C-alpha cells in the first residue's frame, strides 16, 4: 500500500462532437490498446444508429447508464477463517464505471454484425430495462440481497 496518499482524480476532457464528459469516458472505456480513433468511430457510429431510431441519443445513453448502474455490490471479507460476501453500497463514480463496463462487455457478446450496431442495440435494450447489462445488475443485486445477513461486517 502506498505511503504517499491517494493520487488525485484526473479530469476527462469532454468529447469534441457532443461536448459531454460521459461520452468521453465511454469512449475511453471502449478503447483497446490505445486505439482511440477506433473507439470514437464505434461510439459515434452507435450514437448515429440510435439517432436514426430515437430523437436524442445522449439522453438515451444517460437513461441506459442510470438503468444499468448498481446500487449495491458484494465484496469479499475474511473473518476468522471464513470468507463472507459482504454487501456494500457503490459510490457514484464506481457506479458509473461499472455501468459502462457492463454495457460494453454485454454489447461485445451480442450477435449483430458490427460493434457500433452491437453497442447501439445494447444501449436501446438497457434504456428499456432489458438486455445483458441489466441481467448483470440484477444478478449483483440478488447476490447482495442473499448476503444481507453479513451487512454488519462492512468496514
Curated annotation (Swiss-Prot):
Record CDD domains: uS7_Bacteria
Superkingdom classification of source: Bacteria
SUPFAM superfamilies in the record: Ribosomal protein S7 (SSF47973)
Keyword vocabulary terms for this entry: Ribonucleoprotein, Ribosomal protein, RNA-binding, rRNA-binding, tRNA-binding
GO CC aspect terms: small ribosomal subunit
Transmembrane intervals: none
One GO BP annotation of this record: translation
GO MF terms, alphabetically ordered: rRNA binding; structural constituent of ribosome; tRNA binding
Pfam families: Ribosomal_S7
Family of this protein: Belongs to the universal ribosomal protein uS7 family.
Function, as annotated: One of the primary rRNA binding proteins, it binds directly to 16S rRNA where it nucleates assembly of the head domain of the 30S subunit. Is located at the subunit interface close to the decoding center, probably blocks exit of the E-site tRNA.
PANTHER family in the cross-refs: RIBOSOMAL PROTEIN S7
Subunit structure: Part of the 30S ribosomal subunit. Contacts proteins S9 and S11.
Protein's name according to its UniProt entry: Small ribosomal subunit protein uS7
Species assigned in the record: Xylella fastidiosa (strain 9a5c)
Amino acid at each position: 500500500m502506498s505511503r504517499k496518499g491517494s493520487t488525485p482524480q484526473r479530469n476527462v476532457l469532454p468529447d469534441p462532437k457532443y461536448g459531454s464528459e460521459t461520452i468521453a469516458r465511454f469512449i475511453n472505456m471502449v478503447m483497446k490498446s490505445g486505439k482511440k480513433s477506433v473507439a470514437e468511430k464505434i461510439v459515434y457510429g452507435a450514437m448515429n444508429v440510435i439517432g436514426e431510431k430515437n430523437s436524442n441519443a445522449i439522453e438515451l445513453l444517460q437513461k441506459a447508464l442510470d438503468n444499468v448502474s448498481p446500487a449495491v455490490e458484494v465484496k469479499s471479507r475474511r473473518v476468522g477463517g471464513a470468507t463472507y460476501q459482504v454487501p456494500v453500497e457503490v459510490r457514484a463514480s464506481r457506479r458509473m464505471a461499472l455501468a459502462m463496463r457492463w454495457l460494453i462487455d454485454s454489447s461485445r457478446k451480442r450477435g449483430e454484425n458490427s460493434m457500433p450496431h452491437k453497442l447501439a442495440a445494447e444501449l436501446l435494450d438497457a434504456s428499456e430495462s432489458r438486455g445483458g447489462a441489466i441481467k448483470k445488475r440484477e444478478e449483483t443485486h440478488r447476490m447482495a440481497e442473499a448476503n444481507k445477513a453479513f451487512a454488519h461486517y462492512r468496514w
